[in-house]
Amino acid sequence: FVILFLSSVSYCFADIKILKINQSHYMSPYNKDPGDRNLCNKWVLNASQIEKIFSLSDKYKEMSDTMTGFWLWFPCEIAGELIYNKKKWHFSINAAATAEWSDGKETIYWGCSREKCDDMFILPYPGRSYIGGGGKLIW
């Protein structure tokens, strides 16, 4: 049993602007099973969904062992660019409900554990007593 305490950081995402969204990218060239690749190819997010993901997500200062213990990982991501508070960030959203922003000097990690995020991911947050199958792409 692990309890994660995070400092609460308030963000107002009214001034976020999505500049670029790349197609989903499958990151497991050695996995010859077409199932995961097909799921990844079907996964699409638009600008309003990306804004919603970040507005619902919790922010983490580092990718700690504790954070990685709470979320799964899937070999699929959607990357792009955004501006927040007049600062340009590269973002990467993993299909298993985690994300990160980087400006080359600083990296911010995100995890979306709220049910409102589930339909936007292939593998939603597993901490509510299920693993997989809750996203919009059913196994």
Model-derived segments and spans:
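Mature extracytoplasmic domains of secretory-pathway proteins
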Residues: 38-97
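Bacterial N-terminal signal peptides
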Residues: 1-8
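Boundary at the C-terminal end of the N-terminal hydrophobic targeting segment
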Residues: 12-14
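C-terminal partner/receptor-binding element of secreted or periplasmic proteins
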Residues: 104-139
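Acidic/histidine-rich, surface-exposed loop or edge segments in extracytoplasmic proteins
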Residues: 24-40
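A short, sequence-level motif marking secondary-structure junctions
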Residues: 92-99, 113-118
